Amino acid sequence: MDADTINSFFLIGALLIALSVLLSPVSSKLGIPILLVFLAVGMLAGEDGLGGILFDNYSIAYLVSNLALAIILLDGGMRTRVASFRVALWPSVSLATIGVAITTLLTGLMATWLFDLDLLQGILVGAIVGSTDAAAVFSLLKGRSLNERVGSTLEIESGTNDPMAVFLTVTLIAILSSTGTGLSAGFLALSFVKQFGIGALLGFAGGWVLWKVINRNQLPDGLYSILTVSGGLIIFALSNSLGGSGILSIYLVGLLLGNRPTRSRHSILHVLDGMTWLAQIGMFLVLGLLVTPSNLLSIAVPGLALAFGMILFARPISVWIGLLPFKSFTPREKWFVSWVGLRGAVPIILAVFPMMAGLPDAQLYFNLAFFVVMVSLIVQGGTLTKAMSLAKVELPPKPEPISRTGVEIYPTSEWELFIYRLKADKWCIGEPLRSLSMPEGTRIAAVFRNQELLHPSGSTRLEEDDTLCVLAQEKDLAALSLLFSEAPEKASLTRFFGDFFLDIEVKLADVAMMYGLNLGYELQDKTLSNIVEEQLGSTPVLGDQFEWQGLQWVIADVVDHQVTKVGLRLPNEEEEGEEED
């Protein structure tokens, strides 16, 4: 490769990345996932597109995709709160194992019939597209206010279900090739245990070692993110080499680093944010270049049937069976979880396996995987907002600071500087600073007005467009958001948590007359917490609702995983009119 070729490679690569970035706003205008834009740019630059670039190197595509996926999962793990495992761990594990197996089987049966394949070939297609994709799920759910039970289940499932899909894919390839003659049930069981066991062990152990190394070494600030990524990739590669799941390992590494006091954590997250975007762009550009759109035309009709069969039939059945033991999920939540079974890069990466193994019909498997991914991103990803509304899993948006920066004055500092800009509909406009009920231990470090720094006192009144710099910790974010909150834009969300709020420990007898409750003798001594547990079980989350005594009750506040307030929503004329219609 001469200098001109290398320079052309840099020029084309940089142009494609820049074009992807500049076209990214199109996704919000058209209501399509941004990942689809990156994929489309790759396809337009490819063999059948305007660019005419011929790219068919599956080994390079496999390398780029795995590297990108590892970075995306490391970042996703660091941003996942361990607290979410309280309500979502076991449902996620069930979906990541039983759910993937059921989806694989049902999709495989459809593929066998639609494409006249052998049963094992059809099930291989099912295994390739059987798992949800972490890159797609993390990207589409980022910044959305979702019921914790649902959002956490989807994120943890997408980060942990790849080992099952990889295990099934590799096993079926071995059976279909000459190397599968010596396979036994014991060997398969051992392989399954190795995938999950080694992946989990190296993820936790390697993550703990990396955490110690980061905290014990004093380095220039910019090197901590490089150490984190390189350490994560070492564990990712080592896990794969030992027969484990590198994908699971690096997700757990991120989870451990993100939930422990890690030196320069905020700086690491800022760098990872940019690296994750670059990884997503690079991965989907390469996968777009790899496909030949003209080859998809011949499978368009049966491919659509397979994609919609998986979306409307296989995925919902697998979710309902997988979540059967978990009574806390409502039918609406199960429906939403089944709808957000997004497919992305992972199925396309798994479709490269048969190509590299030289299996017959490998090109068909790849084209089918690509087709299913495109349909999933367009149909499921494009309707996500509407699905949230229909399933009623959307929570009122929590006002976020316009900027937040770590104040890392010592290695394990949890202090941050939150920046808020006050708009006209902020409820604290016109209030003197002394009247603000700031969370204990927090301070307003600075106030800017008309781009000038003020010297505020307790009598300083806040005005529209003031910028506040607040020194606090992440645990204070909810209280600060409430203090500097603005009215929800959607009218349907203004009464979401109720018209009146009751303490969870209030006695029913004390409020029965006020709210028209009809209490029998057995309810006289009960508290509201008893009713909540009877209706929602022991792990309710913010936004959970139930109807009791003709009224709608909503979990309105949760502190340290304990319900503290319940909202009472009274029926109004508009709601009654809608019900009559």
Swiss-Prot record:
Q: Name one GO cellular component term.
A: plasma membrane
Question: Transmembrane region positions?
Answer: 6-26, 34-54, 58-78, 95-115, 119-139, 163-183, 185-205, 233-253, 281-301, 304-324, 335-355, 364-384
Instruction: Name a single GO biological process.
Output: cell volume homeostasis
Membrane topology annotation = Multi-pass membrane protein
Instruction: State its location(s).
Output: Cell inner membrane
Superkingdom of origin? Bacteria
Q: How is its activity regulated?
A: May function more efficiently in K(+) concentrations higher than 10 mM.
pH-dependent activity: Active at alkaline pH.
What name has this protein been given in UniProt?
Answer: K(+)/H(+) antiporter NhaP2
**Species of origin:** Vibrio parahaemolyticus serotype O3:K6 (strain RIMD 2210633)
Protein encoded by which gene: nhaP2
